[in-house]
A protein has these predicted regions:
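Flexible "cap/lid" loop of the alpha/beta hydrolase fold
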Residues: 117-156
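Conserved alpha/beta-hydrolase catalytic His-Asp/Glu region
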Residues: 151-206
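Active-site loop/oxyanion-hole signature of alpha/beta-hydrolase fold enzymes
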Residues: 55-94, 98, 270
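Conserved hydrolase catalytic core segment
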Residues: 89-133
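Conserved HGGG/HGGXW glycine-rich cap/lid loop of the alpha/beta-hydrolase fold
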Residues: 11-66
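The conserved beta1-alpha1 loop
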Residues: 27-31, 96, 227
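Conserved serine/cysteine hydrolase catalytic core
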Residues: 184-240
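Catalytic active-site module of serine/aspartate enzymes centered on a nucleophile-bearing elbow/loop
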Residues: 248-279
Length: 279
């Protein structure tokens, strides 16, 4: 799949990414927060069968700026800036995991720029978003011999005290937990982390959850939620969020984990096709 790179100026630094494919326009938002965007390549490739898809590295890591306030408002403004830079008046928005949470905020904040929104296995927008259940399940799926180490590293990371090496080790210990069948997980991709982006955005996520939950009923753009039946993120996190949005729908993909396109190839494209057809 041929990629055309782009770099877009914002009020604070530049954002870099690439675009490929042909068809209705989709902007893909990666997870994290504070994580590199390369893991999303296979998802973008699946969507590229029917769509022109752009994706970009969120601020905090190269090749985008490493500087920022690392707030929800800034992240939503960055989505609008990328759309501006691409010359896209409107586009469909697809977000995964943390990105799947961010797209709820985008649907509230910049609805005039969005043709529709697909949230994929997200941190939800009701209650704590499923965060506590997700964290517990991630640790429960780690082999017992490594569980105490994984827990200790997670606590350091949450406190903002983990070194880059410890953050990488922590992710490697829980990598299998993202999948429906952890022993069969694929090799871990190359990962990078921005601690300032992670800490700043998680703090703002937690602070703004009540406000976001209260705003769900005001969302007017076409909205779909796709979740994995066997994801460590409880499917209810996404499903209950969709139930609060007028006209929204949700789909639980049987046998899929957090990276739904890996264990159920084609389900992401089918969900986007449904969103576009409904819109």
């Amino acid at each position: 799949m041929e990629r055309t790179p782009f770099t877009i100026a914002t009020g604070c630094g530049e954002l870099s990414g690439w675009v490929s494919g042909a068809g209705p326009r989709v902007l893909a938002i990666h997870g994290g927060p504070g994580m590199n965007f390369g893991y999303l390549d296979d998802a973008v490739a699946e969507l590229g069968a029917h769509y022109q898809v752009a994706t970009f590295q969120q601020r905090g890591l190269a090749p985008s700026t490493e500087q920022g306030e690392f707030t929800i408002a800034e992240a939503v403004a960055d989505i609008a800036a990328v759309l501006d830079g691409l010359g896209w008046d409107t586009a469909y928005l697809m977000g995964h995991s943390w990105g799947g949470h961010l797209v709820f905020h985008a649907a509230v904040g910049i609805p005039e720029r969005l043709a529709g929104v697909l949230s994929v296995d997200p941190l939800g927008a009701v209650g704590d978003g499923g965060a506590a259940a997700f964290g517990a399940e991630m640790l429960a799926r780690v082999p017992e011999a490594s569980r105490d180490r994984a827990r200790a590293l997670d606590e350091k990371d949450t406190a903002g005290e983990a070194t880059p090496e410890e953050a990488h080790e922590a992710f490697s210990l829980v990598w299998g937990s993202y999948f429906a069948h952890p022993p069969a997980a694929p090799p871990m991709p190359h990962v990078e982390f921005s601690q300032p982006a992670n800490l700043g955005l998680w703090t703002d996520v937690t602070t703004r959850l009540p406000e976001l939950e209260a705003s769900l009923a005001s969302i007017t753009v076409p909205f779909g939620v796709l979740v994995g039946e066997l994801s460590p993120m409880p499917p209810s996190a996404g499903v209950e969020s969709a139930e609060r949005i007028p006209g929204a729908w949700s789909h639980i993909e049987p046998g899929a984990g957090h990276f739904v396109w890996h264990e159920a190839p084609g389900c992401l494209l089918a969900a986007m096709d449904r969103l576009v057809a409904d819109a």
